[in-house]
Amino acid sequence: TNFSVGGDAKIPIGNALNLDLTFNPDFSQVEVDDQVVNLTRFAISLPEKRQFFTQNDDLFKDFGANNDVTPFFSRRIGVAEDLDGNTIENKIVAGARLSGKLNSNLRLGFLNVLTDADIANEIPSNLNTVFTLRQKVFNRSNISFFLIDRRTTEDFDFISEEEKKNSVTGIEYNLASADSKWNGRAFFHKSFTEGLDDDDMISGMKIERKTLSLNVGMEVI
């Protein structure tokens, strides 16, 4: 009989910050995903339903412009591919998340999750980290900075140098006019991977004008 112990804790820090901790989490009670038939060549991004990842998740999931520019997607944590290329569960050992407000205009997000190694399927143990700050500007707009990092916890012999660690950092400006007629986003992201120096930057801009009778938009990536 396999016996395992796990637990979760929520620790308030001041009036506006919360520290969430999890050890050996059990997500068996999470709502099952809706069945989706994908007839395109693009991957489907199913919504995150695991409670540990959902609180203040807008701090972590809104980077980029569309499904083609998504530097962080929490559903990737806890899944991996076996030797046959099939998607399998990759056990989460522990995680910590600090999120909330530093003041009325500045929000903080920090996420740190350790996944277990599966030597039989040549899956390494990874430490996944996200750090973000979001500063409100003007009436409804904001500027965000983020750093995303994934690295193996030891030198597994089945992992190449390029796969051992990867980091992405970026800055984004999100426009939302006071009258809700103008919305937009401008971003710049840079990736850092050992041994890879090409195609490691991306930038883009999107702006929309919305009224009751008009909806005009432009996007450049």
Regions found by a protein language model. Give the residues of each.
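Outer-membrane beta-barrel channel domains
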Residues: 1-221
